């Protein structure tokens, strides 16, 4: 079995689904944003503000190479922009959590949105969302309709794996 890699726009439920998949399949769960935050000692927002997005993307790209070296399969929850890296391909079996922009914004509280620097300007965030959708679809082994909530997303993911 390869890594099970969850991709999708920020707020689409990747972290929550990763936890549930990990439990269901008895696999360790890794979260790329959390790993980077712990290593740098700053939140993702802090990294963006103090070190810049380019440095965050460099940390992310280096982490992809590290994850490819792991022997055992993991469930990996990724940051929304991870698919922009040329070394992303081959990380594992990818599941795109597809959800419309309006639903994502409704799901995230104001406090949650404040943690995500790329959601500061909703017009720009929607443009980014639309730009990335094609990349998510292109890089997806499977597409999960995440509109129906966590239980339905988990059921779809497990059916794809079976």
From Swiss-Prot:
Annotated ATP binding sites: 11-16, 116
Gene name, Swiss-Prot/TrEMBL: aroK
Annotated Mg(2+) binding sites: 15
PROSITE patterns, per database record: SHIKIMATE_KINASE
GO CC, alphabetical: cytosol
Molecular function via GO: ATP binding; magnesium ion binding; shikimate kinase activity
The UniProt record lists the keyword Membrane: no
Any one GO biological process: chorismate biosynthetic process
Top-level taxon of the source organism: Bacteria
E.C. no: 2.7.1.71
Annotated metabolic or biological route of this protein: Metabolic intermediate biosynthesis; chorismate biosynthesis; chorismate from D-erythrose 4-phosphate and phosphoenolpyruvate: step 5/7
Keyword annotations: Amino-acid biosynthesis, Aromatic amino acid biosynthesis, ATP-binding, Cytoplasm, Kinase, Magnesium, Metal-binding, Nucleotide-binding, Transferase
Enzyme class of the recorded protein, top EC level: transferase
Cofactor note: Binds 1 Mg(2+) ion per subunit.
Binding residue positions for substrate: 33, 57, 80, 132
Function: Catalyzes the specific phosphorylation of the 3-hydroxyl group of shikimic acid using ATP as a cosubstrate.
Subunit architecture: Monomer.
Cited SUPFAM superfamilies: P-loop containing nucleoside triphosphate hydrolases (SSF52540)
Cell compartment(s), UniProt: Cytoplasm
Name of the molecule in the record: Shikimate kinase
Cofactor(s) required for function per UniProt: Mg(2+)
Similarity section: Belongs to the shikimate kinase family.
CDD domains the record matches: SK
Main localization, broad class: cytoplasm
UniProt catalytic activity: shikimate + ATP = 3-phosphoshikimate + ADP + H(+)
């Amino acid at each position: 079995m390869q890594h099970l890699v969850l991709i999708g726009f920020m707020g689409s439920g990747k972290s929550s689904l990763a936890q549930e998949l990990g439990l269901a399949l008895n696999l360790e769960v890794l979260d790329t944003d959390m790993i980077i935050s712990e290593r740098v000692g700053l939140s993702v927002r802090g990294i963006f503000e103090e070190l810049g997005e380019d440095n965050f993307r460099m940390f992310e790209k280096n982490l992809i190479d590290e994850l490819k070296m792991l022997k055992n399969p993991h469930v990996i929850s990724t940051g929304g922009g991870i698919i922009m890296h040329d070394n992303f391909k081959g990380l594992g079996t990818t599941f795109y959590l597809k959800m419309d922009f309006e639903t994502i914004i409704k799901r995230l509280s104001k406090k949650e949105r404040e943690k995500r620097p790329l959601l500061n300007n909703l017009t720009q965030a929607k443009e980014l969302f639309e730009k990335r959708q094609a990349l998510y679809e292109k890089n997806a082994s499977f597409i999960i309709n995440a509109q129906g909530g966590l239980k339905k997303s988990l059921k779809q993911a497990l059916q794809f794996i079976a």
